[in-house]
Amino acid sequence: MTRPPPPLILPPPFRALAVVGEVWPAALDAARAGSEPGTVLWNDDLRRCQAAVILRPDCPLATCAASALRLTALAVADALSAVGPPNVPVAIAPPDRIEIDEGLVGGVRIAAPPGTEADAVPAWLLVGIDLAWLAADPEAPGRDPWRTALREEGFGDVAAADLIESFCRYLRHRINEWEEAGDAPVEAAWRQHTTSGAAGGRLSAARRARGADAAPPVDPAACLAGPSWAGLLE
């Protein structure tokens, strides 16, 4: 008999809704059905850590999509650093990938109502995270130096509930900071997190050769079309 997932302890305005199976399709259905902003859909899966948050923006899609994607990625990086092993090298590979020790561990994604114009305020905005607990090939972990998994990087004692709770706390902090202080602190944190993984990583020389310090801008249209990491966690 499958045990129900533990209840999440989330800061307001978030409230949890556990789902079975893939979170993103369920979250899209919930957003389209008019679920309240702040609803956090998540699963307690053994292979992937997935969550999605329904937001209600008050600015045009072109602005809020790029900001939401960056705030979500920053919150994931913050959460992984908080609940993981000390000094774990977490970094963001723009626009939407999350790396540990320069290996892809997952990413973030966004969605809005189809057909929303760039200068229109969307009825809802959905942000999601998808992280690999286990390697794509559990029989040969570490075979692919460009991909990794949380269990391989020392997160074996971390529960999905703990990681998602931490992510939600940091997401609220990042959103509040952005609403109060604008883009400046987001830009500073983005530069820090998109380069911090370069020092001491297993592929740091190659990363520096590619020019890691020059983080490209986030293209909201491209990100709304789908995540760049789609299919790479399988």
What is the predicted function of each stretch?
Residues 117-153:
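Short, acidic (Asp/Glu-rich) active-site segment that either coordinates a divalent metal cofactor
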Residues 1-86, 104-105, 111-113, 210, ...:
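N-terminal lobe of the biotin/lipoate ligase/transferase fold
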Residues 85-118, 130:
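Acidic (Asp/Glu) carboxylate-rich active-site/surface patches
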Residues 156-208:
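Conserved, helical-rich catalytic subdomain that frames metal- and/or nucleotide-binding sites
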Residues 53-67, 145-160:
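Short histidine-centered catalytic/ligand-binding loop motif
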Residues 98, 203-216:
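Short polybasic amphipathic segments
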